[in-house]
Amino acid sequence: MRWRAGVAVCLKNWQTVIHLGTARVYDTGMNPKIVDAVNKQIRLEFESAFLYLAFSGNLRQYGLPGMGHWMREQYREECGHALRFVTHLENRRAQVVIPSVAAPVYTWETPLDLFRLSLEHERRITASIHDLLTLCREEREYATQCLLFDYVKEQVEEELQVEEIVDIMTLCGSRIDELLGLDQKLASRTTQAWE
């Protein structure tokens, strides 16, 4: 019994080392280019999450709690995306590097500006997912390709959702009653689990 408990402690310590990104415990044969690219995508997903969290606070301060809630749900979704990539690397016994994330830098004057920034950001994430998928095809990394197909579909939906909000806000113009109606509608958003 003691031996088994000792092994469990060792395995737990090995997992800790993997999570901290300080050593590689297993050589799984996963292409290092792919591992690096997935770790970069993890960083981008966490950067996205913190951008949306910042936008959420801005919108709540502006007096639009429904839009703030929508952005907070987007934050949760982006964290889920990052964690799914982490799980993929863990399942492949590849090294996971958890990044530090800098505070987002942006300027805005109106809530519409924040949603336009969101749309630009989602388009950058889409391009990054496409680049990662292209690399996986070139390197014949089929397991990661399968994972990425979900993200390709998700990005189409995310861009469309933000485009529709931008369109509605543009049509609202300076009509505060319309903006408040949209705010109320966005308050009902819930996040799908991605892990």
Predicted segments, located by residue:
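Iron-associated oxidoreductase/ferritin-like identity signal
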Residues: 2-3, 8-195
